[in-house]
């Protein structure tokens, strides 16, 4: 029986509580348990030695983790993945720092990883590769003669040609992507951008059932919006707040606004702070009656752009609080630290407004988690950016343009004063979508489609059989 082989930049924690794991890790773990398999990824360690893979077995799942050398980490992860692909795919060409040697290192690491994975893979195994760190991974596998079914899911947006054309290795990246059998995207706009970019550099034949032919390769390009575990989130949210937080919530009269993001320039945090400032300026009735909590733990702190955004937010938070605070009231709480996911779900449930306004986002699961954590009898209101993939599904949120500070301020005012009947109606429409398109559905849909695609070995076998008749 074929196994599922998952490859991602970081491997999931082998020992960990389900309530602290993200939805993606839980969904993939469940899929691995169903059919047995292997999870292959980086262990987060830097080592100059050629260390063997760290292997661990948990029931019918094997975890195989590799370390990286400093030069590999720098070129593959820090430089090309996170200072070229990440900013470009989030429409920030001004932050791209491209060097050919970094791209070469990126491809070299993908080839090295494919070489280390190959001995662990059986001929009939199905490979599921995740995210932008591994765009060329299938090409590296094919180079080694691997004919397995290989699927790829891009968790971040795929940019339009005006952006993608600025990347020097764009043709190479597109050709390498066509070595996958199935390429999955968060939204139809991402899928269309992929095909549009392909059509600019090679002949693309549009076939049936979302299949295309490019570079003499058949690839299926399809949309799979990622979901969450609504029932698990509800259970976490319904639990009591820790005593200190419960006491703090009791002391805080008025309404709470919550945002939770990684500290990243794609999340629109400075623009969000400015919109909140506009709310306090233009709607003075809310002063003293609301508090805004922005939780933004540091990520990629060794990249200069992330250091810059942290400094900017600290400055903005201090300026806004300095202008509006009183002895009894502080309007904005900026928390640059990590909180357990289980605690965040409880916090979401006690906040009247969820403010999720990225400038560009593949999906944004925080939006779905906020809705799933709400009390159906007294739900909060979600304010969501048009530019998040989640906006395609959560159409009953208050949808906003994150660049329009007046528009976001107006949406905040509307959310803070929305009657219960409207809050309930919007919540019911959104939670129905979230339950229908949950993480299990996402995993199952992708893997079912991948299994239906003939492997390269089957295609070769059919061709040989036909030629001998």
Curated annotation (Swiss-Prot):
Pathway: Glycan biosynthesis; trehalose biosynthesis
Keywords assigned: Glycosyltransferase, Transferase
Keyword Glycosyltransferase: yes
Enzyme class: transferase
Reactions the enzyme catalyzes: D-glucose 6-phosphate + UDP-alpha-D-glucose = alpha,alpha-trehalose 6-phosphate + UDP + H(+)
Gene3D superfamilies xrefs: Glycogen Phosphorylase B
Family, as annotated: Belongs to the glycosyltransferase 20 family.
Protein name as annotated: Trehalose-6-phosphate synthase
Taxonomic path: Bacteria, Pseudomonadati, Pseudomonadota, Gammaproteobacteria, Enterobacterales
GO molecular function: alpha,alpha-trehalose-phosphate synthase (UDP-forming) activity
Pfam families in the cross-refs: Glyco_transf_20
Organism for this UniProt entry: Sodalis glossinidius (strain morsitans)
Listed InterPro entries: Glyco_trans_20 (IPR001830), Trehalose_OtsA (IPR012766)
Task performed by this protein: Probably involved in the osmoprotection via the biosynthesis of trehalose. Catalyzes the transfer of glucose from UDP-alpha-D-glucose (UDP-Glc) to D-glucose 6-phosphate (Glc-6-P) to form trehalose-6-phosphate. Acts with retention of the anomeric configuration of the UDP-sugar donor.
Residues given in the record as UDP-alpha-D-glucose binding sites: 22-23, 262, 267, 365-369
Residue numbers binding D-glucose 6-phosphate: 10, 77, 131, 300
Site (described: Involved in alpha anomer selectivity): 86, 156
């Amino acid at each position: 029986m074929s196994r599922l082989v998952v490859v991602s930049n970081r491997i999931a924690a082998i020992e960990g509580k389900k309530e602290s794991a993200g939805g993606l890790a839980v969904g993939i773990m469940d899929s691995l348990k169903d059919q047995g398999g292997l999870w292959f990824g980086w262990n987060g360690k830097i080592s100059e030695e050629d260390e063997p893979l760290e292997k661990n077995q948990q029931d019918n799942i094997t975890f195989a983790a590799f370390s990286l050398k400093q030069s590999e980490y720098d070129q593959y992860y820090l430089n090309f993945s996170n200072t070229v692909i990440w900013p470009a795919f989030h429409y920030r060409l001004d932050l791209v720092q491209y060097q050919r040697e970094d791209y070469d290192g990126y491809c070299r690491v993908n080839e090295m990883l494919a070489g280390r994975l190959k001995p662990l893979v059986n001929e009939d195994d199905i490979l599921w590769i995740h995210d932008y760190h591994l765009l060329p991974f299938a090409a590296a596998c094919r180079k080694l003669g691997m004919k397995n079914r290989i699927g790829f899911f891009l968790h971040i947006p795929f940019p339009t040609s005006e952006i993608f054309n600025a990347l020097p290795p764009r043709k190479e990246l597109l050709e390498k992507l066509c070595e996958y059998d199935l390429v999955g995207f968060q939204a139809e706009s991402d899928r269309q951008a992929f095909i549009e970019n392909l059509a600019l550099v090679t002949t693309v034949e549009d076939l049936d059932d979302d299949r295309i032919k490019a570079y003499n390769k058949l690839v299926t390009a399809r949309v799979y919006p990622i979901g969450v575990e609504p029932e698990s989130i509800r259970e976490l949210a319904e639990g009591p707040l820790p005593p200190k937080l419960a006491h703090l919530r009791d002391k805080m009269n008025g309404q709470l606004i919550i945002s939770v993001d990684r500290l990243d320039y794609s999340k629109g945090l400075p623009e969000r702070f400015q919109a909140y400032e506009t709310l306090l300026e233009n709607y003075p009735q809310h002063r003293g009656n609301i508090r805004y909590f922005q939780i933004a733990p540091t990520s990629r702190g060794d990249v200069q752009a992330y250091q810059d955004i942290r400094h900017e937010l600290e400055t903005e938070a201090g300026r806004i609080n300095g202008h509006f605070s009183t002895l009894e009231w502080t309007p904005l709480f900026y928390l640059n630290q990590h909180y357990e996911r289980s605690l965040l779900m409880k916090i979401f449930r006690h906040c009247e407004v969820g403010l999720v306004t990225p400038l560009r986002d593949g999906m944004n699961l925080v939006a779905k988690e906020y809705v799933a954590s709400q009390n159906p009898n007294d739900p909060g209101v979600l304010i969501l950016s048009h530019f998040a993939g989640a906006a395609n599904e959560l159409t009953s949120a208050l949808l906003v343009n994150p660049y329009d500070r007046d528009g976001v301020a107006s949406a905040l005012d509307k959310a803070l004063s929305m009657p219960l009947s409207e809050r309930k109606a919007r919540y019911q429409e959104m939670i129905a979508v979230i339950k229908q398109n949950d993480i299990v559905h996402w995993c199952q849909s992708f893997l079912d489609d991948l299994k239906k695609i003939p492997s390269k070995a089957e295609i070769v076998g059919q061709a040989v059989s036909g030629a001998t008749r």
